[in-house]
């Protein structure tokens, strides 16, 4: 499948690190508003988080700072000057004219790659209260209509449709598509639900730790 980046991000698609940064800023804005906007160190920690991230990354501070400045040039993030530390906030919702449900879904797709409706519904519950999968699908269809996301054709063995963002470089998008497991049958559904629940609990603990570190 040929994947074309969204024209809404300009002539140059987003680098994989830029995609990760935006996804992290969206997530932390909604799950830990008391520590948002984020310092450079907090952005780095969020990018390198071991849960709720696909693929895992190990980014250096300088690398994160460089791509934050690149995103600032695109008006997708904004630097908030502070007396103790400078902080970063995302502006892609305003720049791309997104409502909150769309921002949440796009953020999840940036953090986790291709996902099913049920995965998105479960993983979004700490950021937005969707009524059901139909509402998730409706908002995804609006993103698709604007060229920000795509419905992927089912591969062999897959039981559910998957959706993916279109903000990244073609090679990165193809890599995301190929990196996902080819099959998740109905028999594995209970264990997948349990895994998602455990991921949410671990993420909540990590956010509590981040709040404690931010208060020091």
Swiss-Prot record:
The superkingdom of the source organism is: Bacteria
**What SUPFAM superfamilies is this protein classified in?**
Winged helix' DNA-binding domain
Q: Which residues form a coiled coil?
A: none
Question: Which is a Pfam family this sequence falls into?
Answer: DUF480
What family is this?
Belongs to the UPF0502 family.
Name listed for the protein in its UniProt record: UPF0502 protein Pmen_2627
Q: Which organism is it from?
A: Ectopseudomonas mendocina (strain ymp) (Pseudomonas mendocina)
Phylogenetic placement of the source organism: Bacteria, Pseudomonadati, Pseudomonadota, Gammaproteobacteria, Pseudomonadales
């Amino acid at each position: 499948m040929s994947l074309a980046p969204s024209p809404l991000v300009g002539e140059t698609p987003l680098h994989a690190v830029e995609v990760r940064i935006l996804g992290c800023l969206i997530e932390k804005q909604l799950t830990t508003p008391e520590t948002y906007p984020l310092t450079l160190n907090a952005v780095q920690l969020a990018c390198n988080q071991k849960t709720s991230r696909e693929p895992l990354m190990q980014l250096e501070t300088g690398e994160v700072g460089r791509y934050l400045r690149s995103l600032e040039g695109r008006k997708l993030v904004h630097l908030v000057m502070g007396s103790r530390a400078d902080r970063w906030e995302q502006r892609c919702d305003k720049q791309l004219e997104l409502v909150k449900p769309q921002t949440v879904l796009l953020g999840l797709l940036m953090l986790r790659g291709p996902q099913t409706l049920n995965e998105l519904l479960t993983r979004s519950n700490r950021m937005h209260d969707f009524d059901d999968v139909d509402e998730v699908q409706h908002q995804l269809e609006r993103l698709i209509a604007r060229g920000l996301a795509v419905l992927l054709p089912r591969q062999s063995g897959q039981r559910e449709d998957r959706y993916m963002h279109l903000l990244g470089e073609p090679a990165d998008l193809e890599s995301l598509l190929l990196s996902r497991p080819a099959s998740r049958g109905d028999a594995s559904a209970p264990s997948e639900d349990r895994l998602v629940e455990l991921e949410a609990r671990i993420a909540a603990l990590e956010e509590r730790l981040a709040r404690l570190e931010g208060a020091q």
